[in-house]
Structures are given as structure tokens and as C-alpha cells.
């Protein structure tokens, strides 16, 4: 299937920036879902010419893992800050197509609107799939924030060019915060709440943590010639 692929084609720097700016105007910044039954975690791993995309599906209330979708592809786009979705988007779409259970919301290892043009990977892919999405990054990309209190649940907003674009959220006592920004069809405060509810034992939310673990395992198995 080739649906959605046109949203990830490189068109030269100026045209690609223009595409990001156009799509960012279509991002919905409020909650557009009713019940969360299933929640997905999205991550990729790459080495050399190969990239693996993983989507984990968990029951939201219990965080029970019920499905893992894997896609393997050749890397056809260099790593360029601010254009991560063009590199990772196609393999994530392949993983999405294979899912038997489509989640009510996706959490990405990356940015939502906390992006120079307000279209990080969570916003870009959330829009293309028309699915509520959250960006949860390990590092800040744009803006500034005040360090939140050391206790789990504390957060401080991230500001960029006079706008609130995300929040630094403490998901574990005395551990570096994660950087949360809404992706699409969800508010920032709801995004923060969901990240805290899905971050149980670790700094990283469980859906994304599992996606990261499986993407590394899959990539290593492929390189070593072993079955996943």
C-alpha cells in the first residue's frame, strides 16, 4: 500500500519546509477521542542501511502488552534535525498497516508540536493516520523551561517564540524529566496525564519503552541473521 507516502517525500529543503508549515496548520490541539482502550508505543532503530519500525499495543488500563508490529526497511533518507518524520515515517506506516488492533492513541519517541515548524514526528504521523498522538522525547528540541520539582508528577511548560509548545515532565522521583508535547487530536494537559499514567517503573512511558527494546532486538537479529 502506498497511502500516506506522499506526505514523507523529500521535495528539496524549501518545499519540504513549506509542507511542514502547511500540515502544522491542520493539527488539532484539543482532545478528539472518547475512550482509551488500546494505546500504542512507536519507536525505530537504525544501523547502516537498515531501519526497523515497531508499534507496541497495550491495554491502557492495565498496560498489558497485546500486540507487536514490526516493519523492516532500507534507510532512504539521511538524519536531518527537524525532519525526523521523513526518515522514519515510511517504516512506521508499514508497521501500522500490519496491526490487527488499531490503537486509540499513539505515543512517539520524539516531538509533537515542540518543533521549529510545529510538526514533529508525533504530529506529522498522527495527522497522516488521523489518530490522536503524543510526542515524548528524551531531550528538548526547541524552547526553554524551568526545571520542575524533583517529585514524580511535577512539570513545567516549555515555551518557544511566545507559545507553550510542551512540558518537561518528571515521570520518576529525582530523575531527568521527559519532554512531552501534543501530537494531534489531544490537548497538552491530557498528554501529560497519559504520559504519567503510562510511566510506572521507568522514566520512559511503558508503550515507548517496550517499542524501543523490541526495535533494538529486531535490528540486532536482522544483522546477525537470526529470526526475530
Curated annotation (Swiss-Prot):
Coiled coil: none annotated. One of its GO terms (cellular component) is cytoplasm. GO terms for biological process: DNA repair. Mg(2+) binds at residues 43, 109. It is found in: Cytoplasm. GO terms for molecular function: deoxyribonuclease V activity; magnesium ion binding; RNA endonuclease activity, producing 5'-phosphomonoesters; single-stranded RNA binding. Its cofactor is Mg(2+). InterPro entries: Endonuclease-V. Its EC number is 3.1.21.7. Its main location: cytoplasm. The record marks 79 as: Interaction with target DNA. It catalyses: Endonucleolytic cleavage at apurinic or apyrimidinic sites to products with a 5'-phosphate. Gene3D superfamilies: archaeoglobus fulgidus dsm 4304 superfamily (3.30.2170.10). Keywords: Cytoplasm, DNA damage, DNA repair, Endonuclease, Hydrolase, Magnesium, Metal-binding, Nuclease. DNA repair enzyme involved in the repair of deaminated bases. Selectively cleaves double-stranded DNA at the second phosphodiester bond 3' to a deoxyinosine leaving behind the intact lesion on the nicked DNA. NCBIfam families: PRK11617.1. Belongs to the endonuclease V family. This is Endonuclease V. The gene is nfi.
Amino acid at each position: 500500500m502506498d497511502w500516506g507516502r506522499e506526505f514523507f517525500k523529500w521535495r528539496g529543503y524549501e518545499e519540504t519546509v513549506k509542507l511542514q508549515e502547511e500540515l502544522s496548520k491542520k493539527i488539532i490541539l484539543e482532545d478528539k477521542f472518547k475512550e482509551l482502550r488500546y494505546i500504542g508505543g512507536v519507536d525505530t532503530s537504525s544501523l547502516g542501511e537498515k531501519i526497523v519500525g515497531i508499534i507496541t499495543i497495550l491495554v491502557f488500563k492495565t498496560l498489558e502488552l497485546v500486540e507487536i508490529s514490526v516493519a523492516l526497511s532500507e534507510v532512504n533518507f539521511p538524519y536531518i534535525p527537524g525532519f525526523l518524520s521523513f526518515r522514519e515515517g515510511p517504516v512506521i506506516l508499514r508497521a501500522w498497516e500490519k496491526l490487527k488492533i488499531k490503537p486509540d492513541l499513539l505515543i512517539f519517541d520524539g516531538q509533537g508540536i515542540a518543533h521549529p515548524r510545529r510538526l514533529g514526528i508525533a504530529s506529522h504521523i498522527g495527522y497522516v493516520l488521523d489518530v490522536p498522538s503524543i510526542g515524548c522525547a528524551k531531550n528538548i528540541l526547541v524552547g526553554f523551561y524551568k526545571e520542575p520539582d524533583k517529585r514524580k508528577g511535577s512539570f513545567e511548560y516549555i515555551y518557544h517564540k511566545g507559545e507553550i509548545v510542551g512540558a518537561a515532565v518528571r515521570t520518576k522521583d529525582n530523575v531527568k524529566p521527559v519532554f512531552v508535547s501534543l501530537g494531534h487530536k489531544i490537548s497538552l494537559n491530557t498528554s501529560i496525564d497519559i504520559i504519567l499514567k503510562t510511566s510506572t517503573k521507568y522514566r520512559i512511558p511503558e508503550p515507548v519503552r517496550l517499542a524501543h527494546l523490541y526495535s533494538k532486538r529486531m535490528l540486532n537479529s536482522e544483522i546477525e541473521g537470526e529470526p526475530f
